[in-house]
């Protein structure tokens, strides 16, 4: 399904990513990381959500990055294994680590055979700088995905405020950064409350690879995004008679303007008594 990227095949796979980007203008991303050191109440303000996310991302190491490049009839996926996380020494959420292990991540192998985070992002930054033209970045509930990507590309802690974070994301990634979870809320029969797998099930899409592996999750995110764009554009075209490309532009603008922070690390509001999972 995906090209697994390790220390021993890094250069060949990075060259493949560089070549593929010449033909694709869309990238779906997913991250696997050691969970959250601080959990955020569901009713927290945007600034508190951002403060907690910054603390979590600044103090933990990314374990996997999934990249799916797609467009012009091409779809190709890479799963980059990153070696900085040390289970015995690095800060982590024990429940999240157990969850990753139960879903098949071999943390010992990733530690021994993976790529250093700084080494990977130095070359990935160069590859992105070679890309000319607008890029579309696609996430699913993607605040942490964007945050780890930003941390890797800048090789710095996250900005101090959510406003600075949004500005830096736009500066580095451009204006067109989509969140498929939000898009699902615009579609008949779906909801922004649904997880990625449930949305795929409703759309009758079969997963390729294992859930909660960054490569498989990014690939499924890319396919769901493509389907939702197609359905949204065509449904609006039928109802308004406007050209499909005009409708897609409006959707892009709407996605860009939706700045509400979506977090993957939170605790339930006590009065509701409901449990939420990552």
From Swiss-Prot:
It is found in: Nucleus; Cytoplasm. It catalyses: Exonucleolytic cleavage of poly(A) to 5'-AMP. The lineage of its organism: Eukaryota, Viridiplantae, Streptophyta, Embryophyta, Tracheophyta. Its cofactor is a divalent metal cation. GO terms for cellular component: CCR4-NOT complex; cytoplasm; nucleus. Its main location: nucleus. GO terms for molecular function: metal ion binding; poly(A)-specific ribonuclease activity; RNA binding. InterPro entries: CNOT7/CNOT8/Pop2, RNase_CAF1, RNaseH-like_sf, RNaseH_sf. A divalent metal cation binds at residues 30, 32, 145, 217. Ubiquitous transcription factor required for a diverse set of processes. It is a component of the CCR4 complex involved in the control of gene expression. Pfam families: CAF1. This is Probable CCR4-associated factor 1 homolog 5. Belongs to the CAF1 family. Its EC number is 3.1.13.4. Gene3D superfamilies: Ribonuclease H-like superfamily/Ribonuclease H. Component of the CCR4-NOT complex, at least composed of CRR4 and CAF1 proteins. Keywords: Cytoplasm, Exonuclease, Hydrolase, Metal-binding, Nuclease, Nucleus, RNA-binding, Transcription, Transcription regulation. It comes from Arabidopsis thaliana (Mouse-ear cress).
């Amino acid at each position: 399904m995906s090209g697994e990227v390790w220390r021993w095949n890094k250069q060949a796979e990075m060259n493949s990513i560089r070549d593929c980007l010449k033909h694709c203008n869309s990238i779906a991303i997913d991250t696997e990381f050691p969970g959250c050191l601080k959990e955020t109440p569901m009713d927290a303000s945007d600034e508190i959500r951002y403060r907690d996310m910054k603390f979590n991302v600044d103090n933990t190491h990314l374990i996997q990055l999934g990249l799916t490049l797609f467009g012009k009839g091409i779809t190709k996926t890479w799963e980059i294994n990153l070696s900085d996380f040390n289970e015995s020494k690095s800060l982590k959420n024990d429940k999240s680590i157990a969850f990753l292990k139960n879903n098949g991540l071999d943390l010992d192998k990733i530690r021994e055979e993976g790529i250093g985070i700084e080494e990977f992002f130095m070359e990935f930054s160069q590859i992105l700088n070679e890309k000319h033209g607008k890029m579309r970045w696609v996430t699913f509930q993607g605040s942490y995905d964007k945050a780890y990507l930003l941390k890797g590309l800048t090789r710095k802690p996250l900005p101090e405020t959510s406003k600075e974070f949004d500005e830096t994301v736009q500066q580095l990634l451009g204006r067109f950064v989509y969140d498929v979870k939000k898009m699902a809320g615009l579609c008949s029969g779906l909801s922004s409350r649904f997880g990625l797998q449930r949305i795929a099930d409703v759309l009758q899409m079969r997963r390729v690879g294992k859930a909660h592996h960054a490569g498989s999750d990014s690939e499924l995110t890319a396919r769901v995004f493509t389907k939702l764009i197609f359905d949204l554009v065509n449904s609006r075209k039928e109802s308004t008679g406007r050209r499909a490309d005009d409708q897609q532009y409006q959707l892009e603008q709407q996605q860009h303007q939706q700045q509400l922070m979506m977090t993957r690390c939170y605790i339930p509001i006590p009065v509701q008594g409901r449990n939420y999972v990552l």
